[in-house]
Every structure is written in structure tokens, then in C-alpha cells.
Design a protein with these regions (language model features):
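N-terminal leader/targeting and pre-domain segments
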Residues: 2-55, 136-139, 144-154
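Short, structured coil/loop segments at alpha-helix boundaries
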Residues: 3-4, 61, 65-69, 95-99
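Generic ordered-secondary-structure signal
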Residues: 24-26, 34, 64-65, 78, ...
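A generic short-segment signal for beta-strand/edge and adjacent turn/coil regions
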Residues: 26-31, 80-86
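Short linear motifs at secondary-structure transitions and domain/linker junctions
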Residues: 32-37, 61-63, 87-93
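Local sequence-structure signature of Cys/Sec-based thiol-disulfide redox active-site neighborhoods
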Residues: 44-83
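Thioredoxin-like thiol-disulfide oxidoreductase module
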Residues: 73, 84-153
């Protein structure tokens, strides 16, 4: 009977150790930018604060009013597909000071782009208006996937 209890305890210990080890490895390799596809619209001051305090993630800077909704939908779908989230700054936000540029709010990217930042530094960006609307979501997914591999995964 003692051998049976010892065996059960040993097996339980191994299972627990494997579970902890797997959780550690999974968290070690997890991305800093994971999420569920949410694209959070920030005010200019919120963006400035985010870039100063964190500055890591996918950032969309919108300027073209007519294409903003189309671009946002494609970016959201690509983010959902790649399990990441991002932030958006609209150049026509009521609190966006027209005498200032996106640089004044912590962004170095061009207008109508999705960019990836790490610790406040622009790593790369994709120009949304350079792609045919029928291919944009695919291009965005590829951009996000390669950015995750290059900048956020060990």
C-alpha cells in the first residue's frame, strides 16, 4: 500500500513539475503585444502619455478622413488574426492641435500607416494607401506577423 501511495505522489509531482515548466516556457516566449484584435482610439494626450510611459506596440496614425474606417477595419481584422492589439491616433481628433505634428504626440511614423514601436522607438511602418484595398488585410497580417517575430519573440 505504501508503494502505491509513493507511486501516486511521484506521478502527481511529475505532472505538476511539467505543468509549471510548460507555463514558464510559454510565458517566456509570449509576445509583449498580444491581444484580441482591439484597436484602441486614443486622444492626442493619451497617445503622448502612452508613448512616454510604455511606447511598445502597434500604432495606427490616421489622417485621411475618407479611408479611416476602411483602414481601421482592415487593421482590426489583421490584429485579430495575429492575436495582437494596438492603439490609434486620428489626425482629425478634436484635441489634435493642427499647428502640431504627430511627433509632438510621440509618433515618428507617417500619416495613414500602421507602425511598430519598441520602447518608444519606431521600428518599421506600413503605408496603408500603397496597397489595393483587396490586398490590404493580407499585407497587414504579414506585416504584423513579421514584426512580432523580429521585435517581440525571443
Amino acid at each position: 500500500m505504501k508503494n502505491k501511495k509513493w507511486l501516486i505522489s511521484a506521478v502527481a509531482g511529475i505532472v505538476v513539475a511539467l505543468g509549471i515548466g510548460t507555463a514558464f516556457v510559454s510565458s517566456y516566449n509570449s509576445s509583449e503585444v498580444k491581444g484580441n484584435g482591439e484597436l484602441e482610439e486614443l486622444s492626442p494626450l493619451q497617445m503622448k502619455k502612452f508613448m512616454k510611459e510604455d511606447g511598445t506596440g502597434f500604432i495606427m496614425f490616421s489622417f485621411n478622413k475618407e479611408n479611416r474606417d476602411l483602414y481601421m477595419n482592415d487593421v482590426k481584422r489583421a490584429m485579430q488574426q495575429e492575436n495582437v492589439e494596438g492603439k490609434e491616433l486620428d489626425g482629425h481628433h478634436p484635441k489634435f492641435d493642427g499647428s502640431k505634428s504627430q511627433n509632438d504626440y510621440g509618433l515618428d511614423q507617417h500619416a495613414d500607416t500602421l507602425a511598430v514601436y519598441k520602447d518608444g522607438e519606431l521600428k518599421q511602418q506600413i503605408e496603408l494607401d500603397e496597397y489595393d484595398p483587396s490586398n490590404l488585410e493580407t499585407e497587414l497580417s504579414h506585416f504584423i506577423e513579421t514584426s512580432k517575430e523580429m521585435y517581440f519573440e525571443e
